[in-house]
Amino acid sequence: MTQLINVNSRSYRLSSAPTIVICVDGCEQEYINQAIQAGQTPFLAELTGFGTVLTGDCVVPSFTNPNNLSIVTGAPPSVHGICGNFFFDQETQEEVLMNDAKYLRAPTILAEMAKAGQLVAVVTAKDKLRNLLGHQLKGICFSAEKADQVNLEEHGVENILARVGMPVPSVYSADLSEFVFAAGLSLLTNERPDFMYLSTTDYVQHKHAPGTPEANAFYAMMDSYFKRYHEEGAIVAITADHGMNAKTDAIGRPNILFLQDLLDAQYGARRTRVLLPITDPYVVHHGALGSYATVYLRDAVPQRDAIDFLAGIAGVEAVLTRSQACQRFELPEDRIGDLVVLGERLTVLGSAADKHDLSGLTVPLRSHGGVSEQKVPLIFNRKLVGLDSFDRLRNFDIIDLALNHLA
């Protein structure tokens, strides 16, 4: 078996012990802090004695797909190409959903590990990620969302519902993430993969603030699985795709800037196009509202004028040109607009008011997407060495850290 693989200009030492990398969707660090203070997460509370706790930066836009793909490629979106759920294809003049693996421009560490002879398993909460994460992977790969459809030929495993002992969970539930962890435990104790990637959903974090009973219960559930993985002898590495913040005013009303309406009023209809890369089929989570937007300008709209106009709107943190955004956030130039707009910590960006259905938001809006959700945990159940070689820790360094930097 090959002991070293090279993927996207980085080298990875293949692990001799089962290694589990976990992406906890929407894991603002305060969730862990509050759960520890409430006595709900004893394993995480004791981890500093034998493990390592660090903080890193996620990719901006701080959304699920760009960050999960960055983690499994060990590279930013400028390398792998996935910079959101949607981009605007200038040639076809259509908004394109980027859930298909054909938009992925780089190999994954997972697929390369499998080629090197390792047994690799991937379990995701939502099926939208399975196709991307499992690209060219010969191993085990399935989602909790469609666990009832899992079969040996397509997913590399079977009878997963019976093995886990849970029904197929609702996509809008904490159970969807628990299914991921329970499935991971079943795989660890039976097939014992060399490497496992588990990716959850941020349903709980979108609805419940850190320290609330619901949030603490969710983290207590995860903590119990982390402990089980540890007891089974696995190397456990935990990070997040992004953080999470309230996006409301002082009395809980959503703070929304409808950029398309504002731009239409300033420049006229159809002179600009606002694209929200957070948009996905699961709008109950966030109403397709996040703190990152990209804007396409028609010829008649001067870029400098549009930048000044948008930057002058209260709640806008920054407006960047395409080249500035690509340099700062390492994004692919052909998949973002002329401008990138970032909302402040308490503000989300919408397109037009009539394009957003907020009826599913039964609690004060919580979302992500901006720089304000960039700080994420990097937690390991082992001591690490050689960290001086990192100028800046990123969530997509986690596989490198787990495989190459164990003491």
UniProtKB/Swiss-Prot annotation:
Keyword Zinc assigned: yes
Keyword Ubl conjugation among record annotations: no
Subunit structure comment from the entry: Homodimer.
Record-listed Zn(2+) 2 binding positions: 202, 206, 368
GO molecular function, one term: metal ion binding
GO biological process terms, semicolon-separated: phosphonoacetate metabolic process
Keywords from the named record: Hydrolase, Metal-binding, Zinc
Entry-linked CDD domains: Enpp
Major enzyme class: hydrolase
Record-given protein name: Phosphonoacetate hydrolase
Coiled coil: none
Disulfide-linked positions: none
Catalyzed reaction equations: phosphonoacetate + H2O = acetate + phosphate + H(+)
Pfam families per UniProt: Phosphodiest (PF01663)
Domain of life: Bacteria
Higher taxonomy: Bacteria, Pseudomonadati, Pseudomonadota, Gammaproteobacteria, Pseudomonadales
